């Protein structure tokens, strides 16, 4: 995809025609890739640099100086708080799931070779179709932790993230971006077409990842003796998930406009976690690490919202393919919002692209960041790309399969005509 930025007004500082904000954002991403042991510090420094530049030089989209910053945060706080509460809440949920000892009985039903590891990815894929992809990835990570004796290959971790994002790409309940499409008026069946590409993609990346994992640490062949499932803890897991699903459905069906006014889903998960304390104590010890990872992701997301991107190239399958690669480093929520504003996309193709595309780098999706909090060794772009090479291949193959089998059927623009080039906002 040929992404171009329109002519920069003289009042907007730029380097070789590229706004300074993009340069600062790119420098932050490079820093995260190079200094993977200090990702939070790099992200916070990058955020401070972008905010400082907007504050003192260009102003914000909502206005200059402090008033503009406050107005911008007022627009974004619901999304940020939802992400924060979901990341921390689902981290506690995944620990509940692991301690329920359900993963310890999985050897009863899973094959005892690489096919067992692949079946686990399919389970994550299915879970993500009706759960949030963050929860599906963390549950998958908890199962892998037990089944592979806490030795999980980075390539397999990348596949877990890919499975969770693929499973959510065709469901209006499985991912934030598809829920945004649903709220905006896109029909669920139009989004469902994404599963054509997602199914091919999970096969392409799942088999190599499963073989990687089996060679690295074979799956348990026998369940632990005298395993007794903690049923009350299972009930806690079901209760928290039910709260999230019910809130998501009720808000988006009955009062979709309210979803932008308060972080209902995140708050419902937090309340469910607190209410379940009377049944089983959550593993509060993991909260600091979960919060650290959440703040890192929120820093990236917030930086992305400050970028002066107002328009996308014309809606086409080439644009959708490119947006998938962009979503690996640029938050897919604002990309999806811009695409909805523009209209004219095949929403199934776009849902697959921005959903699965974020799996190519560990911080490209909220599911990847959440899982990396459990497996810190995965916080390396180089190792993720090296061992998770099959995810990038799967994205391209899955996209091609989606176009070949389902075709490109764009919907008529429903938000008015939008130009076909990137434009630069002065923020004033």
What is the role of each PLM region?
Residues 9-17, 34-39, 65-83, 111, ...:
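Interfacial loop-to-helix junctions that mark the boundaries of transmembrane helices
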Residues 240-345, 426-427:
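Transmembrane helical segments that form the transport core of multi-pass membrane transport proteins
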Residues 115-169, 180-184, 337-352, 377-380:
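Hydrophobic transmembrane alpha-helices that form the pore/transport pathway of multi-pass ion
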Residues 18-29, 36-63, 80-92, 233-243, ...:
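Hydrophobic mid-bilayer segments of alpha-helices in multi-pass membrane transport proteins
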Residues 93, 99-102, 150-154, 158, ...:
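Juxtamembrane and boundary regions of transmembrane helices in multi-pass small-molecule transporters
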Residues 16-21, 79-83, 109-122, 148-158, ...:
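Membrane-interfacial loop-to-helix junctions in multi-pass transporters
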Residues 36-39, 93-101, 127-139, 167-175, ...:
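Short helix-coil transition sites and intra-membrane helix breaks within transmembrane domains
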Residues 40-49, 106-119, 152-162, 285-298, ...:
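Cytoplasmic-side transmembrane-helix entry/capping segments in multi-pass membrane proteins
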